Amino acid sequence: MTQLAIGKPAPLGAHYDGQGVNFTLFSAHAERVELCVFDANGQEHRYDLPGHSGDIWHGYLPDARPGLRYGYRVHGPWQPAEGHRFNPAKLLIDPCARQIEGEFKDNPLLHAGHNEPDYRDNAAIAPKCVVVVDHYDWEDDAPPRTPWGSTIIYEAHVKGLTYLHPEIPVEIRGTYKALGHPVMINYLKQLGITALELLPVAQFASEPRLQRMGLSNYWGYNPVAMFALHPAYACSPETALDEFRDAIKALHKAGIEVILDIVLNHSAELDLDGPLFSLRGIDNRSYYWIREDGDYHNWTGCGNTLNLSHPAVVDYASACLRYWVETCHVDGFRFDLAAVMGRTPEFRQDAPLFTAIQNCPVLSQVKLIAEPWDIAPGGYQVGNFPPLFAEWNDHFRDAARRFWLHYDLPLGAFAGRFAASSDVFKRNGRLPSAAINLVTAHDGFTLRDCVCFNHKHNEANGEENRDGTNNNYSNNHGKEGLGGSLDLVERRRDSIHALLTTLLLSQGTPMLLAGDEHGHSQHGNNNAYCQDNQLTWLDWSQASSGLTAFTAALIHLRKRIPALVENRWWEEGDGNVRWLNRYAQPLSTDEWQNGPKQLQILLSDRFLIAINATLEVTEIVLPAGEWHAIPPFAGEDNPVITAVWQGPAHGLCVFQR
């Protein structure tokens, strides 16, 4: 039998050099590491990794080729109270594997035991890693590098975006290939999107609890192999990487960036009753935040929390991010529950992973977006991330909904959010683009559901409607559910228009949820993470062409307004913005705090947003000049000069002079 050579301790993972494969694995507490390779008949061959450099175990297998299936058995103490859960009976996934073969089914053999070890061997059913070779012709691909001030983000799910698209070939719907199809790219271009932000595409697993209920993890926030693409989105799992890169190359040619939603905060191993796939059996004590009793700190709500202050875990996370940029040419990341990235365990702007990203010549040049919270004490960190990061702005989301749907927000608070929440983000040299403004996201009501439902309806998730937030700031306009009278439909449409206008014409970086421009509904489900069905798939045949055109017109209007694209904080007297009352006069202090919800926002001295968020039709006197309403609030031809606007209840209009 071929013997392993010592090999090299870097880089991590399995790497083919044309003559064989070098294997490396980090484990600070292991006593022995076996490389397990499987032949075409499934026969297992074990080799002790002979190299041990610091905490890196390594070996070189001559004559090994791409396509080789492998895993690890890691020997060490079973001492749960100290955080050690080694179990060599369980085949483990290489954390840096580029491809996984097999399914993560709910099976007792894929668990290692809670208090007592389960020594039943699981190699027959355990997923296997696959050695890959990386040869790809990027041609003349170059990142679009869209300036932050010009960025329009579109948050979408790989499958849900195209699975029901009638103009995309059936055989590629719901896949990476569909993202790069000309029909999809033309749609994004016509809409005005500059960045496609994808929900997780790294390999993930469905939680055992969901599998037992006949459900699956649809969103993908349950990672198991951070360097491997999720194969279910590929036409052929063996070519997933090239399919993904083909899509990115096509999107780049159209000037569209690709941002990945990435989950570095926890793993699919869940809590101590969860499965054993990889990290827990390789070095539980190093990879996770461990309590004094040996259990996990659950700062994520998912059972475990990755210790991103441990040097080896920082190296792992940094290598993962570099891989997606260097190998797949992605243009940035949105970090799920990103406060975990800064935990030491308290949150720090100079936490090790933040410092590593800032000092990396690759990662410091891409777009970085934080979901700036986790669920632990001190986890709400909106506005506190390092200057390289933009952040989801939940202040904007709640303010926009409260202003237009709950009618309980003063003008001053609304204006503050409209002006990129400068009270939150104007610090440490950050620009207005640091505020990622959103009204909706994958997590929560869709825009249509915001105006059709007062309450969540998550019964299909199997938790008796207990899951999902109750703080929705929604308004069903008098009737719970879709449909209704013509008057009801029109009032809901007006609210949608008001929310979209506020989102797309405010200062900061707008993020649009895919389907909101169609009128997509999830029928009141505000936590559809486990609904891989028509509840979440965009039904293009039912898309509202009028709403899509309205959204596109707003986006293209935004690109014409210097005050929004120049990405500079607005200052008194700089000509970027003036705040006026219904009589075109500056607002008084009392009007800001207690006045009627009527406001005129003059941008770049040429564009005027007139707002009447009261219950009555109100006459709004426009500032001096020849004003005419512009698309999407009026047609292109024969503009009518207006000095006074008869503002409908809960209405708004945009004018130009």
Curated annotation (Swiss-Prot):
Residues 458-467 have a biased composition (Basic and acidic residues). Its EC number is 3.2.1.196. Signal peptide: none annotated. One of its GO terms (biological process) is glycogen catabolic process. It catalyses: Hydrolysis of (1->6)-alpha-D-glucosidic linkages to branches with degrees of polymerization of three or four glucose residues in limit dextrin. This is Glycogen debranching enzyme. GO terms for molecular function: glycogen debranching enzyme activity; hydrolase activity, hydrolyzing O-glycosyl compounds. It comes from Escherichia coli (strain 55989 / EAEC).
